[in-house]
Amino acid sequence: MDRLETTIAGVKLKSPVMNASGTAAYGQQMAKNIDLNELGAFVIKSTTMEPRAGHPWPTTAATTGGWLNAVGLKNPGIEHVLAYELPWLAENYPDLPIVGSIAGSNPDDYVEVAKRMATAPNVKFIEVNISCPNVAKGGLAFGTDPVVVEDMTRRIKAVVPNKPVFMKLTPGVTEIVPIALAAERGGADGLVMINTLMGMEIDLETRKPRLSNGTGGLSGKAIHPIAVRMIHQVREVTNLPIIGVGGVFSAKDALELMVAGAGAVQVGSANYGNPHACHDIIQGLVPAMDQYHFNNIAEFSSEK
């Protein structure tokens, strides 16, 4: 077996490295810079029932230690994705597992998008972005309430019984463990953690926030220690597969998340400054494994 191969929720991956949702859209641009077949899987941007225009510009801002973004889930909607984006990936990368990231404004939206996303043959995982605001609860993110997380997970698994469903956890909670356990009770096949942290920057010239939305999700190196801590906490209480994300800029960063408890990793903000980031991290894994005396990536898997 190749030293980089591993298995997550029963799906074989040629490497443990994926892109993070929203950092490579549906793959066409990233494919100009790296061979997508190097990836363990490709994660599409979060897709909703209807097309979304997203927030007006500016939607991103570089900040100390990372990026702030408030794109507003801009996407063409599930029907377009099923008709055009996923077929393009299937035609050009037939052996590449696709992670279908989904989002919504209410639980019914999530369930319907998950059901439709799962019909695509090349979608091997469903990733549920539960950092979205719950309109019925005054805008509070779905992922902050264990009761909501458990119920939503159960409802999604009811319509997607034959493909792994991974819940992507928000770090914007007092305690992450109850949220992870709620997802497990609901039948989640795995977890993706962590999503971005809410932040803000103010332009001193204008006295206004730098992002049109005011606040935005903080990603990048600044959140890496938080991801390590939360993954470690959750690994202590569950054997669910974990895909780690948060400030992965190097092979050593990836290994740190895996030592904490992840079986695979996603690369997000690093792609903004370096379009070859995923390739570079994959190429650096074997030398880093040799340096720190790891035999293979599969030893990090919770599926022994």
Swiss-Prot record:
<dbReference type="GO" id="GO:1990663">
    <property type="term" value="F:dihydroorotate dehydrogenase (fumarate) activity"/>
</dbReference>
<feature type="binding site">
    <location>
        <position position="168"/>
    </location>
    <ligand>
        <name>FMN</name>
    </ligand>
</feature>
<dbReference type="Pfam" id="PF01180">
    <property type="entry name" value="DHO_dh"/>
</dbReference>
<feature type="binding site">
    <location>
        <position position="220"/>
    </location>
    <ligand>
        <name>FMN</name>
    </ligand>
</feature>
<dbReference type="InterPro" id="IPR050074">
    <property type="entry name" value="DHO_dehydrogenase"/>
</dbReference>
<dbReference type="InterPro" id="IPR033888">
    <property type="entry name" value="DHOD_1B"/>
</dbReference>
<keyword id="KW-0963">Cytoplasm</keyword>
<protein>
    <recommendedName>
        <fullName>Putative dihydroorotate dehydrogenase A (fumarate)</fullName>
        <ecNumber>1.3.98.1</ecNumber>
    </recommendedName>
</protein>
<dbReference type="InterPro" id="IPR001295">
    <property type="entry name" value="Dihydroorotate_DH_CS"/>
</dbReference>
<dbReference type="InterPro" id="IPR024920">
    <property type="entry name" value="Dihydroorotate_DH_1"/>
</dbReference>
<keyword id="KW-0665">Pyrimidine biosynthesis</keyword>
<feature type="binding site">
    <location>
        <begin position="195"/>
        <end position="196"/>
    </location>
    <ligand>
        <name>substrate</name>
    </ligand>
</feature>
<dbReference type="InterPro" id="IPR012135">
    <property type="entry name" value="Dihydroorotate_DH_1_2"/>
</dbReference>
<feature type="binding site">
    <location>
        <position position="21"/>
    </location>
    <ligand>
        <name>FMN</name>
    </ligand>
</feature>
<feature type="binding site">
    <location>
        <position position="129"/>
    </location>
    <ligand>
        <name>substrate</name>
    </ligand>
</feature>
<keyword id="KW-0285">Flavoprotein</keyword>
<comment type="function">
    <text>Catalyzes the conversion of dihydroorotate to orotate with fumarate as the electron acceptor.</text>
</comment>
<comment type="subunit">
    <text>Homodimer.</text>
</comment>
<keyword id="KW-0288">FMN</keyword>
<feature type="active site" description="Nucleophile">
    <location>
        <position position="132"/>
    </location>
</feature>
<comment type="pathway">
    <text>Pyrimidine metabolism; UMP biosynthesis via de novo pathway.</text>
</comment>
<dbReference type="InterPro" id="IPR005720">
    <property type="entry name" value="Dihydroorotate_DH_cat"/>
</dbReference>
<feature type="binding site">
    <location>
        <position position="194"/>
    </location>
    <ligand>
        <name>FMN</name>
    </ligand>
</feature>
<dbReference type="InterPro" id="IPR013785">
    <property type="entry name" value="Aldolase_TIM"/>
</dbReference>
<comment type="similarity">
    <text>Belongs to the dihydroorotate dehydrogenase family. Type 1 subfamily.</text>
</comment>
<dbReference type="GO" id="GO:0006207">
    <property type="term" value="P:'de novo' pyrimidine nucleobase biosynthetic process"/>
</dbReference>
<feature type="binding site">
    <location>
        <begin position="246"/>
        <end position="247"/>
    </location>
    <ligand>
        <name>FMN</name>
    </ligand>
</feature>
<feature type="binding site">
    <location>
        <position position="45"/>
    </location>
    <ligand>
        <name>substrate</name>
    </ligand>
</feature>
<feature type="binding site">
    <location>
        <begin position="69"/>
        <end position="73"/>
    </location>
    <ligand>
        <name>substrate</name>
    </ligand>
</feature>
<feature type="binding site">
    <location>
        <begin position="268"/>
        <end position="269"/>
    </location>
    <ligand>
        <name>FMN</name>
    </ligand>
</feature>
<dbReference type="GO" id="GO:0005737">
    <property type="term" value="C:cytoplasm"/>
</dbReference>
<dbReference type="GO" id="GO:0044205">
    <property type="term" value="P:'de novo' UMP biosynthetic process"/>
</dbReference>
<feature type="binding site">
    <location>
        <begin position="45"/>
        <end position="46"/>
    </location>
    <ligand>
        <name>FMN</name>
    </ligand>
</feature>
<feature type="binding site">
    <location>
        <position position="129"/>
    </location>
    <ligand>
        <name>FMN</name>
    </ligand>
</feature>
<keyword id="KW-0560">Oxidoreductase</keyword>
<dbReference type="InterPro" id="IPR049622">
    <property type="entry name" value="Dihydroorotate_DH_I"/>
</dbReference>
